[in-house]
Structures are given as structure tokens and as C-alpha cells.
Amino acid sequence: MVNVPKTRRTFCKKCGKHQPHKVTQYKKGKDSLYAQGKRRYDRKQSGYGGQTKPIFRKKAKTTKKIVLRLECVEPNCRSKRMLAIKRCKHFELGGDKKRKGQVIQF
């Protein structure tokens, strides 16, 4: 389980110094219908002849690399950058911190 705080003081390229950053998890955007590869694929798929390209079935990984999106909280900056961290099965953003010697509540 990886627990990452919602804010982080780190270097901002635009400000040129360490600033607090808001941390969110990166999500992939919607695929464009008009990208060249998609247009080519749709053109090839249309008409008779079934599936024209091989469908990938050999999945190797069970996890994805976590990518953090850091946004500078300075009002006139707001620059954003990505930061990749290692692979993990469980990722948590801003969960409560683990304390030593605490009794586990169920």
C-alpha cells in the first residue's frame, strides 16, 4: 500500500524555487477519433474481411506505474508537471498516516 500526501513542497520550474504543490493522480484522456492511426484503422476495418489487425492477448503486467500530477499552488503560476513513481498494487492519496504502537481498530 502506497500512501501519498495531497500536498508536497517541491521545486517549481516556472517559479524557480520550492513551492507547495497540489498532488493528484494522472488519468488518461479520451482517445481522439481523428488521430492518424485511428483514422487508418477505421478505414482498414470498414467493409468486408473481418478483423484486420492482431488483437493483443499476452498481458504481462498486473500493475501500472503510478503517475502523480503536481500543480503549483502559487495563484499566478499554476504550472503542472508529472512525476512517475514505482509500480504498486494499492495506491492511496491523502490517507491517514500510520502510527507506531497503535492498536488496530476493526
Swiss-Prot record:
Intracellular or extracellular location(s): Cytoplasm
Segments for region (Disordered): 34-53
GO cellular component: cytoplasm; cytosol; cytosolic large ribosomal subunit; postsynapse; presynapse; ribosome; synapse
Spans traversing the lipid bilayer: none
Pfam families: Ribosomal_L44
Primary site of residence: cytoplasm
GO BP terms, alphabetized: cytoplasmic translation; translation at postsynapse; translation at presynapse
Coiled-coil stretches: none
UniProt-recorded Gene Ontology molecular function terms: structural constituent of ribosome
Keywords noted in UniProt: Cytoplasm, Ribonucleoprotein, Ribosomal protein
Complex and partners: Component of the large ribosomal subunit.
Family listed: Belongs to the eukaryotic ribosomal protein eL42 family.
Cited function: Component of the large ribosomal subunit. The ribosome is a large ribonucleoprotein complex responsible for the synthesis of proteins in the cell.
Protein known as: Large ribosomal subunit protein eL42
Source species: Mus musculus
